[in-house]
């Protein structure tokens, strides 16, 4: 099979997400003290926090086994997505882009977790006293990737419905 006709060439997007995330995390760790916060906008801070769990600090209060669990989970899911990219056609641009963003984000957070034992988060959106959970670029890549997959699924469903009519 000609690999250029698969979704694998979209992995450059994974590399961009991966390295952008790690570079920004390095900048935060080098320039901020833990919990230091700089106000950028009336609803947005850059705040250095450590997340020992998953999204929204899920399982953060456990004894440490979750580090290995989340690293393994990221690797397994990434390999599954790589298989999907291999099976996809290059013309499936929206789906391939979504998958690539998810791989880049998952592997960046896994690398962070393997190196530090936690994930560095720093985007802090808030309104008055309410703060959204702090997150990072890898999280953004994963969410945008999932959103693109959802949009693609709706588009595929619309195509099927229009063919049936």
Swiss-Prot record:
Q: Which residues form the active site?
A: 121, 139
Q: Which UniProt keywords apply?
A: Aspartyl protease, Cell inner membrane, Cell membrane, Hydrolase, Membrane, Protease, Transmembrane, Transmembrane helix
A GO cellular component term found in this entry reads: plasma membrane
**Where would you say this protein principally sits, based on its record?**
membrane
One GO biological process this protein is involved in is: proteolysis
Decide whether keyword Isomerase is in the record: no
User: Catalyses which reaction?
Assistant: Release of signal peptides from bacterial membrane prolipoproteins. Hydrolyzes -Xaa-Yaa-Zaa-|-(S,diacylglyceryl)Cys-, in which Xaa is hydrophobic (preferably Leu), and Yaa (Ala or Ser) and Zaa (Gly or Ala) have small, neutral side chains
Molecular function per GO: aspartic-type endopeptidase activity
- EC number(s): the record gives 3.4.23.36
Localization of this protein:
Cell inner membrane
Leading EC class: hydrolase
Q: What pathway or pathways are given for this protein in its record? A: Protein modification; lipoprotein biosynthesis (signal peptide cleavage)
Instruction: Enumerate the transmembrane spans.
Output: 9-29, 65-85, 97-119, 134-154
- Name the membrane topology term: Multi-pass membrane protein
Q: Name the Pfam families for this protein.
A: Peptidase_A8
Q: Which family does it belong to?
A: Belongs to the peptidase A8 family.
Functional summary from the UniProt entry: This protein specifically catalyzes the removal of signal peptides from prolipoproteins.
Q: What is this protein called?
A: Lipoprotein signal peptidase
Organism of this sequence: Histophilus somni (strain 129Pt)
Gene name per UniProt: lspA
